[in-house]
């Protein structure tokens, strides 16, 4: 799609073309879509993430587990890690968890199993490479799949991720050495866990809060007692 640079480097036209390909890929278009758009600019392309999601929903309804695993594997190869997780896996997870149609529970279970299975294969491959060790601790989650999607995203950024998936309300202990420690908050953080985070931070530990909701939240039993 992009010709190699000459001795003087890439031309302006080549750089423009490369940026266009990147933008199309970030929009969830396939290589076939991008090739068509480059060669026939007047063609209106269907596709994008919505079509990729529809393809997976069809597989979850009708196809074998191997077909589902193969599709996830190819999607992870064809798209960058952040786009794959943020624009594809997370919207699919949300859709499946709000779906009330017939067979919804089975589709969600198959999706969760496929995501965890993909993570296990990626983690095994990462152990064979020279990658940066990172400890991902679930402080709180809104569902059982989100911590594994985040682990896949971090793997795509070049980390070798150890996951503590159970949000138990007490600090998790890593089994391996790590250079970074991320505390994932999908549904807030309790005052006690926030205090532990602050103490670790003040001690100079390589720790950071991350996730979709890092607000301090009181435990529900405390709220009930004060109501």
Where are the model-predicted features located?
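Basic, Lys/Arg-rich alpha-helical nucleic-acid-recognition elements, primarily the DNA-binding modules
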Residues: 1-45
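C-terminal regulatory/effector modules of DNA-binding transcriptional regulators
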Residues: 116-227
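Generic helix N-cap/helix-start motif at coil->alpha-helix transitions
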Residues: 48-50
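Mid-protein regulatory/catalytic core that forms ligand/cofactor-binding pockets
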Residues: 54-159, 163-166
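Charge-rich, acidic-biased intrinsically disordered regions
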Residues: 44-46, 137-138
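Short secondary-structure capping/turn micro-motifs that flank functional sites
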Residues: 40-41, 92, 170-171
């Amino acid at each position: 799609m992009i010709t190699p640079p000459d001795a003087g480097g890439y031309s302006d036209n080549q750089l423009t073309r490369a940026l266009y390909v990147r933008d199309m890929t970030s929009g969830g278009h396939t290589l076939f879509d991008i090739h068509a758009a480059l060669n026939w600019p007047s063609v209106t392309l269907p596709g994008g993430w919505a079509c990729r999601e529809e393809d997976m929903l069809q597989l979850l309804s009708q196809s074998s587990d191997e077909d589902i695993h193969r599709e996830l594997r190819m999607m992870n190869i064809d798209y960058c890690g952040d786009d794959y997780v943020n624009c594809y896996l997370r919207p699919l997870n949300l859709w499946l968890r709000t779906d009330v149609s017939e067979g919804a529970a089975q589709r969600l279970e198959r999706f969760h199993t496929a995501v965890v299975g993909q993570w296990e294969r990626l983690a095994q491959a990462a152990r064979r490479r020279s990658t940066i060790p990172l400890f991902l601790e679930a402080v709180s989650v809104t569902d059982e799949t989100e911590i594994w999607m985040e682990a896949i995203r971090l793997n795509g950024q070049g980390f070798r991720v150890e996951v503590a998936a159970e949000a138990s309300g007490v600090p998790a202990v890593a089994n391996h050495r790590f250079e970074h420690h991320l505390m994932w908050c999908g549904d807030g953080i309790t005052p006690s866990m926030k205090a532990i985070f602050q103490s670790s931070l003040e001690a100079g530990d390589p720790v950071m809060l991350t996730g979709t909701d890092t607000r301090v939240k009181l435990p529900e039993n405390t709220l009930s007692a004060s109501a």
